[in-house]
Swiss-Prot record:
GO CC, any one term: chloroplast envelope
Protein name in the entry: Diacylglycerol O-acyltransferase 1
Source organism of the structure: Arabidopsis thaliana (Mouse-ear cress)
The family this protein is said to belong to: Belongs to the membrane-bound acyltransferase family. Sterol o-acyltransferase subfamily.
Lineage: Eukaryota, Viridiplantae, Streptophyta, Embryophyta, Tracheophyta
Single GO biological process annotation from the record: embryo development ending in seed dormancy
Pathway where it operates: Glycerolipid metabolism; triacylglycerol biosynthesis
Disruption phenotype: Decreased oil content and modified size and shape of oil bodies.
Primary location group: plastid
Gene name tied to this protein: DGAT1
GO function terms (MF aspect): diacylglycerol O-acyltransferase activity
Length: 520
């Protein structure tokens, strides 16, 4: 009871002795001295005669600091006293004895341990203010451990399933027509350049230019489709040709559209500024056709030099992740797909189980594909060509809606869509909603071409899958605007990982197997 009635502090003096300082009396003196603009801890007090006994100067300094912290309620017991007398000016000059006195005073039972209201780190008000680096490291460790166990279990159960002809087989030699078709695609940019050269020299009119560009772009698509359908080529070879075909088509459209716009601006500026002119450069077109962009412009931001060591490291990563992607396909995806049934036929629970089992390896393959192409390959190409603008993607994994995902994950295509589809539709007085639908329609057509033509199977699964994104865009945008929550991100990941891609893989595989079975 004596301690409760009269809280005190035992301090260590410089000569090694000890003194007892009454904390309550010091606080009363502090309040009286503050009212008279003084910091006196000694004087006369009619109510407490013993207050005439003053405290040592160094103790008074530390008492002032603690009393102020106690009054403000903002001090952290553990953190405020690390480092001795740093809280007071020149506190370190007191030597080791002063630091011992601080520690002795701070951890006295009479000193308050709770000075302000605080939330738990995982409470709803404080959870997003904390650093979760440790939990992230834990998730990485658990992910590595779980997947390592699954890989070992798979190898023990099924053995090594990757065949020796995984990278190259004799069948690849039969795909030489597709290889020749890839090389011959360079004819179409030359044809587009010739058209622009003719219109520059006033040999043809604008309607003829538009008609010729339409013929060139249509032929550029139909010719590879015909070659792929006629040749009994491997699926990977067909997909490669169709992807290259789509890239060249998008570049040709951008070249024609941008050249038309520059030509229009130059013609309009002739009256006001004769120095503004339109020119055609084969060098700029050739650079554009190999540059990692789909939007044509006469010049691009360039980097200063080529970092050869950096390119070598990125190329090594490309080989490693491509091999890892092939390992997952051969060891996991192919066995799961072969041992499954058509998802639209048979037991519903069985179909759900197969889709869920396929979702994880399919996600890993997709992430590896994204990393290999959009980060490694496009950056390697940009480095070799000194291409400066390397925003090939944004943080699409944080997308709050499906619309945000489509705007962030593939920046070259997004910029092309905005530049040559979306805003031209708006300038033509087309409603915004219809312009979005048109953009998704173009994307759906090319997704279907890249998958259906190599499979020689036109079931429109890829087309419908892309068009199904349109209502999801409006739904997730509404949820984001109405509630401001991350439910849109959850819906995106569910469609992306669980429902969408695994379902399309199963649908195309079984339809392809059924077609081959009926042909044999």
């Amino acid at each position: 009871m004596a301690i409760l009635d009269s809280a005190g502090v035992t301090t260590v003096t410089e000569n090694g002795g000890g003194e007892f300082v009454d904390l309550d009396r010091l606080r009363r003196r502090k309040s009286r001295s503050d009212s008279s603009n003084g910091l006196l801890l000694s004087g006369s007090d009619n109510n407490s005669p013993s207050d005439d006994v003053g405290a040592p100067a160094d103790v008074r300094d530390r008492i002032d600091s603690v009393v102020n912290d106690d009054a403000q309620g903002t001090a952290n017991l553990a953190g405020d006293n690390n480092g001795g007398g740093d809280n007071n000016g020149g506190g370190r000059g007191g030597g080791e004895g002063r630091g011992n006195a601080d520690a002795t005073f701070t951890y006295r039972p009479s000193v308050p341990a709770h000075r302000r209201a605080r939330e738990s780190p995982l409470s709803s008000d404080a959870i997003f203010k904390q650093s979760h680096a440790g939990l992230f490291n834990l998730c990485v460790v658990v992910l590595i451990a779980v997947n390592s166990r699954l890989i070992i279990e798979n190898l023990m159960k099924y053995g090594w399933l990757i065949r020796t002809d995984f990278w190259f087989s004799s069948r690849s030699l039969r795909d030489w027509p597709l290889f020749m078709c890839c090389i011959s695609l360079s004819i179409f940019p030359l044809a587009a350049f010739t058209v622009e050269k003719l219109v520059l020299q006033k040999y043809i009119s604008e309607p003829v230019v538009i008609f010729l560009h339409i013929i060139i772009t249509m032929t550029e698509v139909l010719y590879p489709v015909y070659v792929t359908l006629r040749c009994d080529s491997a699926f990977l070879s067909g997909v490669t040709l169709m992807l290259l075909t789509c890239i060249v088509w998008l570049k040709l459209v951008s070249y024609a559209h941008t050249s038309y716009d520059i030509r229009s601006l130059a013609n309009a500026a002739d009256k006001a500024n004769p120095e503004v002119s339109y020119y055609v450069s084969l060098k700029s077109l050739a650079y554009f056709m190999v540059a990692p962009t789909l939007c044509y412009q006469p010049s691009y931001p360039r980097s200063a030099c080529i970092r050869k060591g950096w390119v070598a490291r990125q190329f090594a990563k490309l080989v490693i992740f491509t091999g890892f992607m092939g390992f997952i396909i051969e060891q996991y995806i192919n066995p799961i797909v072969r041992n499954s049934k058509h998802p639209l036929k048979g037991d519903l629970l069985y179909a759900i189980e197969r889709v869920l089992k396929l979702s994880v390896p399919n996600l890993y393959v997709w992430l590896c594909m994204f990393y290999c192409f959009f980060h490694l390959w496009l950056n390697i190409l940009a480095e070799l060509l000194c291409f400066g603008d390397r925003e090939f993607y944004k943080d699409w994994w944080n997308a709050k809606s499906v619309g945000d995902y489509w705007r962030m994950w593939n920046m070259p295509v997004h910029k092309w869509m905005v530049r040559h589809i979306y805003f031209p539709c708006l300038r033509s007085k087309i409603p915004k909603t219809l312009a979005i639908i048109i953009a998704f329609l173009v994307s759906a057509v090319f997704h279907e071409l890249c998958i259906a033509v190599p499979c020689r199977l036109f079931k429109l699964w890829a087309f419908l899958g892309i068009m199904f994104q349109v209502p999801l865009v409006f739904i997730t945008n509404y949820l984001q605007e109405r509630f401001g929550s991350t439910v849109g991100n959850m819906i995106f990941w569910f469609i992306f990982c669980i429902f969408g891609q695994p379902m399309c893989v199963l649908l195309y595989y079984h339809d392809l197997m059924n077609r081959k079975g009926s042909m044999s």
